[in-house]
């Protein structure tokens, strides 16, 4: 995939200048005359090739460029005189203070870090007797009664009153067998 991408980019890089030249001069093939490009001489600045090649931007920068300025010009410059004075002085006395680390320390009493629960280590006691739940295949299946509601429509014919259908719910128990194994 990456190789194909690099090949396509290289082909485009090689063909784009020719395509751009054809687009800028679309009817160059139609004319039989010579195309003379006239530059505005006031706008074109003459830059000798020697000065362009000697320019620092085109050279590899293997070391930092240090301008020759007086010592008071930059506070960040390396001064050999100061280093010589530091090397020639007597060594500093060994400090009685304990050297502090770079990171901040807790001010309180150190506490024990508890082991996380997901790193449960098995003990020797649990290896002898492994707990496997026993399932008896001969256990009878117990049916559990589940009450259900069914609506029964009773039509009562009363000669004294109008005929009205009465809905009365009636409960029945249906045995449901559970297949838990």
Curated annotation (Swiss-Prot):
Keywords from the named record: Glycoprotein, Milk protein, Phosphoprotein, Secreted, Signal
Q: Does the keyword DNA damage apply?
A: no
Task: List GO terms (cellular component aspect).
Answer: extracellular region
Please state the protein's primary subcellular location.
secreted
Q: In which tissues is it expressed?
A: Mammary gland specific. Secreted in milk.
Sites carrying sugar chains: 134, 144, 155, 162
Keyword Membrane listed? The answer is: no
GO BP annotations listed: lactation
Annotated positions of the Phosphothreonine modification: 123
Q: Where is this site: Cleavage?
A: 118-119
Subcellular location, record wording: Secreted
Query: One Pfam annotation, family name?
Result: Casein_kappa
Modified sites of kind Phosphoserine: 162, 178
Q: Which residues form the signal peptide?
A: 1-21
Give the matching PANTHER family: KAPPA CASEIN, KAPPA-CASEIN
What this chain does, per the entry, is described as: Kappa-casein stabilizes micelle formation, preventing casein precipitation in milk.
Q: Which family does it belong to?
A: Belongs to the kappa-casein family.
Entry protein name: Kappa-casein
Gene symbol? Csn3
